[in-house]
Amino acid sequence: GSGGKINYERYFAPEELDGIYTPVHRPDSVGAAPLEGRNVVVFVMESMSAEHSAHLHPELYADRQVKGYTPFLDSPMQAGYCFERMYANGTRSIQALPAVLGSIPSFKTPFVLMPQALAPTRQLPRILRDKGYATAFFCGSAAGSMGFGAYARSAGIERLYSREDYEARHGRDDFDGYWGIWDEPFLQYAGEEMSALPEPFFAALFTLSSHHPFVVPDAYRDLLPEGLTRNHKCVAYTDNAFRRFFARYAGEE
């Protein structure tokens, strides 16, 4: 329950368990390019699935006119590293950040609603902050939505950017009427703010336009493929939002 009590069971001493199995893998090489001091940006995409991608599932689109709903995102998958069997244990939006940024499994009560979420934890943002990174989190929903604010602070994130921050600069015309700011303008805003962060920085961004009730801006209603489900058009909208984001910011160091 939300009381948050977790029973701690100890079956092995840490050194004994390491001798049996360790999930820590230390590669001999991290690749040709040095990674230390690089900016790190993690995009968490609402309701995205491998089945939306013609690159990941070409067999689904072999006989269809529409070749997937993520034509832009398919491009960096082909040009960069793409891990096809990488999973995070979160099944709902509220569980996404602890799963992706902290490798925290899903409990009966979402982690962000548990008292333990308020205590400092060694998650990716805090690890990088301890190495001198500025840390930020972007989401176009209201600041207190789904406990993200309290969670982000406990995870080591210093600065949160929300719907309120966007509207303070750009007004209220881009509110989708349900969850927050449409992905396209919010991604552009996030890029502006990331450009002003001290380097090196870590930033996480959570999209929202592909969430139920699956609506897109009027200007895009007739420009995007209908798809087989209501979500497909929203996925195509967010994919295009990323296209515009990378077109503007991909060349920045």
What are these regions (language model features)?
Residues 1-253:
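Soluble catalytic regions of membrane-associated enzymes that act on cell-envelope
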